[in-house]
């Protein structure tokens, strides 16, 4: 068990929109400072780092940022044994929407049907049957999301620079149910859905037993302790459309002391977090798909002769 006196915590932050400090995070850090923790923070994009010289210098890193640079630096620290909240492996799995969607399905979390591709023209036949939401596979803050209802709207979407996750559009009430979790405590706020809704606080909402169960199941599967979910309340029940580690907790009353308590407990080693190992328990779906099963033709003609010559 660690002693809090003099423990060094480092918050790996992201540039905020608007560019003002998070009141929740400021209050939580003030509480931790009064309890004897030393707090540092920084934004990866605002400094320069020589990767081969980077070494863990804090007792705990709190990964708040979702940017590629922050995740890369976190991976270097993780490889050298740095403790992180949330754990690095949990964050990297959560950030990858393709991996996350498969895990949701594997453990029975209700989530939309989805497809992945790097070529949106391949989704023509799918969008003819249903509206779709197109997301960068490692996006955050709603950046790069498009909603398309027909092939013409699909054709108007710029070609993606990275792979995309294409989700079946789920009709809801027009509001997001934002669910926030700290350990075993679950909170929720409602806000109108929009591309900039992540900047709005929303209004507090009751958490149903079903939503609470879904939220805690996600934390157990991904190994998360501080996280949030976007839920659509469909006619058939709640559906998870996104999962994020260390969200802003906007609109949750008196949340900063609860976050500070959780960070303190983790820093002092009172508990750990670990993603579930599903390799032994996962069962194949009833309708299985093999990767490239139908691709018997070499797709790059100029390589055909070279491959035959190498045999």
Language-model region placement:
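Protein kinase-like catalytic core scaffold
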Residues: 132, 165, 187-188, 227, ...
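A long amphipathic alpha-helix within ATP-dependent nucleotide-binding catalytic cores
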Residues: 195-240, 244, 252-284, 288-301, ...
